[in-house]
Amino acid sequence: REVGANTVRLAHYQHSPYFYDACDRAGLVVWAEIPFISVMNPAPGAHENCRSQMKELIVQNYNHPSICFWGISNEITIGGERPGLLDNLRDLNALAHEMDKTRMTTIAHVSMVPMENDMHHITDVLSYNHYFGWYGGELENNEQWLDKFHALHPDRPLGISEYGAEGIVSYHSDTPKCKDYTEEYQAVYHEHLAKVIDERPWLWATHVWNMFDFGCDARDEGGVKGRNNKGLMTLDRKIRK
């Protein structure tokens, strides 16, 4: 509420009923999804596991009015596109619609997915995870990419499922620049993206990554091990960046 948010995209796993209850009370629009991420396991049992998790996600949370979108995967081609992926995604999309005819389906693409791709035509709406101005490229690439995609696919509902930059509260600079991990660059980044988003009302939704810093064992960035510092607040929820 304090940041003016009206929607939440949940991370790629099952969440506590407490959080869904809180979103119901707050009137937030929720995107809930299964942990089908990064790369597809081609084993038949793996897809059955995905189907099982989709069924459980919907059955357990069907009655939460805050949930408006079921997500079928996140950055599933970051490890390469495997044979059978499109069929698996289509099957998960059909399963979600079979179990719940009232809600839309969505997908979060990794930035490298081409603008012309069959995955764009599976779910009801689609979004991209873009980090231009952080992991690569320039800040201005955000609006350039969005406008080009919209020109190519004016009838496809496009959103941003992730965007962000890391800021460590003890790092500061009078001349902030990309990858310096300062609060100042994080502010420059988000001020730019806020303007980009505001000027494009055709974006169906935008979701910042992330509301809070969070633990991640594999990470070692900015001199801080085991933590992703993209949060708008610190890990302990005490400091607003």
Give the positions of each predicted feature.
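Extended substrate-binding grooves/exosites of carbohydrate-active enzymes
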Residues: 1-241
